[in-house]
Amino acid sequence: GICVLGATLELASGQLLDDYLQTRFFQPMGVRASFYAGRLETEEVAALYGSTGVVQRTREQQTGQEIPTETGMGASYYPGGLTISAADLAKLVAILANDGEYQGETYLSPESVAAMETVQFAVSQEGTAPFDQCLILRRQDGLLGRNQLYYHTGSAYGVYSLLSYDPDTGDGVVVITSGAPWEVDDRGLYGLCARLSEKLYAAMEEHEI
């Protein structure tokens, strides 16, 4: 589905999705990221480790990735292929947490954010808590010490990640791990990511960050 969505956006804009994102979001926000790691410098990326300590992707393998030259050629990168730091991903999460704005600039309309947060259907899974599926985002009540959170998870080549934000307070947390064992908690979240996120939410409340 994300492959089709990415390719559709490319057809609509007449350019690679990554080029559109660079111009519309990444460059104005000071974000260094790309769906094509070949656009980044070797020193900007980290080696990716599996849970046994074996390297899954070296820095050179990542930055040696071929960069598509025509729309549609890079569609397979769009489901989970974004290379970005936790700090820069937090900037993108801030857009959602603040109804489309970041540092006084509007990047998405409030209506677009509301559409992304609209529940499409509920999902029940054996062994984990049910969640509401929105557009890309998921939502749960009583999660990580908050009344409700929107969130998105990701995993590839030893990386487990979790971004989340509280629509009531406008804050959020991003955790990206490499080399952690595969573990899913009773809420369906990667265990280490969830534990770190909960501690960070608690710290923000305690110190009013």
Model regions and ranges:
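Hydrophobic alpha-helix feature that most strongly marks membrane-spanning transmembrane helices
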Residues: 94-97, 101, 121, 168, ...
